[in-house]
Amino acid sequence: KIGINILVITNNSQVFSEYYPENVITMNFEHWRESIENIRKWSERYDLKAVIGVDEESIILAAKLSESLCIEHNSLESVKLTKNKYLMRRELKKSGLKSPWFKRFSIDEKPKDIFTELRFPCVLKPTFLSASQGVLRVNSFKDFVKGFELLSDLLTEMKVKKRGGDQVKWILVEEYIPGKEVSIEGIVNEGKLKDLAIFDKPEPLEGPIFQETILITPSILDEHLQFSLLETAQTALKALGIRKGPVHIELRINDKGNYILECAARSIGGLCSKVLEFKGAMSLEELILRSALGRNIEKTQLIDKVVGVMMMPIEKSGILKEIQGIKEALAMKGITDLQTTIKPGEILEPLPKGDRYLGFLFAEGKNQDSVKTVLQEAWSKIVIVFEEI
């Protein structure tokens, strides 16, 4: 559609690599230098202009490849800041943004030895995981001990250790921030944030786990507050050194001000981006590509309608047998799509240890209440058939 050649760099074999072998390179992300010459040759042939990480696992690699190939990108240091919640908190505090109290503890610490350093309620979280994995609110020292042990166990699991490197040795403890939660989707160009959407999260996220479910845009917050949120986001991006590419920023709002929860140098996760439709029949992914190529996206606007997405939660552990009620949910007025992301036979693991959703429900309506209601009603028709482990 936009007349470009794409090279897919993946750590998993892709079905279409059989049909487009010149456009797919499969590699071990940890040993990327072994494949750099193949990428360089492709670049010489097709004039590689940008390297884009599409998820949490690939954004560091994108920065490394860009640096090696002398392609404009966020610095490796700045991307690493977004991937380490402790370092991010430290930088945001230095910038003068509102910050909760926070402290990092080794998983080898004994809770009784750090009791005097704690204030309740507080939140425990790994420094590197996403999708609310391992994030727990605790209201007492008894809860803290249980939560600390749970996270210590999670951080010693092999697949988690492989992702986290040295960060698996640490648990971040920070003040629980009450208030309404929102997220901002945007693209940064030369350090300036172009906001694409502000998502409201109409269901309260108060713990003990933080299961995100419904996102709705456009926001119904007043314009002054929305402007304030964008100012906070811009300050955070400057503090972290993010100057280019897609960003996904999460914030809490209360009577004390705006607090950054997350600032990721990537677009929104999962299939959530499907809910965003821009004038000119453009998707979020197309906008990201256009911006990466230096094309002007400043006048881009969302199509004027109220839309929402529900990340269908995993509520119990087991082996998935079947998801029932999909046809009934899709038949509801206002539901525009439903896509599952876990197949029968796969293991279901709920938060706080899990990191996946059953799938995604999409809806549109005349206002936020109608979108929220139809998503909740459609979800009520879904029945998960599973086998206990």
Segments and roles (model prediction):
Residues 227-249, 255, 264-321:
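Active-site "cap" helix and flanking loop/linker of ATP-utilizing ligase/carboxylase catalytic domains
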Residues 136, 175, 217-218, 277, ...:
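Short, well-ordered beta-strand elements within core beta-sheets of diverse protein domains
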